């Protein structure tokens, strides 16, 4: 919905994602409404893939105005079942949730921020969550990762303003809880 809104307001939107069919569907929806968009396959955990994405974007559009870091998710082993306890968390899945959400925000920020510094301007918007501030029970890994994103955003905003000026902004949004296929079971089975 955000990508479509931005495209309909005149932005040239690049959807970066792993799922080709889903990414192409968003692009086709945007184009059907008169917007401009392309899809590029990426992996937010692989710097070299993101660097190639950036090169392709700059070759196509000449610049990057904004980066919206929205990759993320949760895993069953990083949550606590209704009948479980903290001791049932699986450390390896907890780490995967931290990696995808937090490190999956840091790496794209590193890659795309370099281009914004060259341009002298740009915007980064990171997706945190209300779970960072009011953690729901059961989503320990996700809440910890999103709290990390909020803290990272505050750090990066200060770092960028001090070293590169105020024309590059870094902010976060913290959406509330939306029922999706990814979280339906968690939110509807208390």
Language model feature labels by segment:
Residues 11-25:
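Conserved glycine-rich Rossmann-like NAD(P)H-binding loop of the short-chain dehydrogenase/reductase
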Residues 109, 145:
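Active-site helix of classical SDR
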Residues 78-86, 90-95:
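Substrate-binding pocket helix/loop in short-chain dehydrogenase/reductase
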Residues 81-84, 163-167, 172, 177-190:
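A glycine/serine/threonine-rich, flexible loop-to-helix segment
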Residues 1-14:
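Canonical Rossmann dinucleotide-binding motif of NAD(H)/NADP(H)-dependent dehydrogenases/reductases
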Residues 20, 41-53, 91:
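The beta1-alpha1 cofactor-binding region of Rossmann-like NAD(H)/NADP(H)-dependent oxidoreductases
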Residues 129:
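Residue(s) in the substrate-gating loop at a strand-loop-helix junction
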């Amino acid at each position: 919905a955000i990508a479509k809104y931005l495209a309909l307001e005149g932005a040239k939107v690049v959807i970066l994602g792993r799922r080709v069919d889903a990414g192409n569907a968003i692009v086709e929806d945007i184009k059907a409404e008169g917007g401009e968009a392309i899809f590029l396959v990426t992996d937010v955990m692989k710097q070299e893939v993101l660097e190639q994405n950036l090169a392709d974007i700059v070759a196509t559009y000449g610049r990057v105005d904004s980066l919206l870091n929205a990759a993320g998710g949760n895993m069953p082993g990083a949550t606590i079942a209704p009948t479980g306890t903290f001791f049932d968390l699986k450390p390896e899945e907890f780490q995967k949730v931290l990696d995808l959400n937090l490190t999956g925000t840091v790496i794209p920020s590193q890659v795309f921020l370099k281009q914004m510094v060259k341009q002298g301007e740009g915007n980064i918007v990171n997706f945190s969550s209300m779970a960072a501030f009011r953690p729901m029970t059961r989503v320990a890994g996700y809440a910890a990762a999103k709290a990390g994103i909020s803290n990272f955003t505050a750090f990066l905003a200060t770092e960028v303003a001090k070293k590169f000026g105020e024309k590059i902004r870094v902010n976060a949004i913290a959406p509330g809880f939306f029922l999706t296929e990814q979280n339906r079971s968690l939110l509807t089975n208390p």
